[in-house]
Amino acid sequence: MSRATAEMLAPQLANIDPWARYNYTPAALASFLAAGEADAPRYAIAVGRAIAGAVCIRKNWLRGPYLQFLGILPPYQSQGIGSSVLNWFESQAREVGAQNLWIAASEFNVRALSFYERHGYGRVAVLTDLVVEGSSEILLRKRLPRC
């Protein structure tokens, strides 16, 4: 993702949970989104000519990729974009023979947890104090059948 795209998205993403609740600054989010990591590429999510959000995939994690970041801007939420991203995430994993898909979501982010569970992810662990002291993250896993 380009620095310009990251800087455009970051202030908007910083105003929605979980980043708002965790007090992530636009500068911190922009730095994360613009970072160049070969094993964790960042992508802008486009809808037509508009940028609707961002996604980061950590490719090699526990026999499958980890969806490290998924942020959809409010005007684009509840339109199937997140589902399309999850379908893409799964198809990319299947292409490389991954056995698992991994996601973590904040315990308070009930809407995200419900979304992931509707897409076949199951809760496998509670990670206390991972991001912020006193909060928990829920690790979710989706097993992919071997072909």
Model-predicted regions and their roles:
Residues 62, 122-123:
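Short, functionally important structural connectors and interaction interfaces within domains
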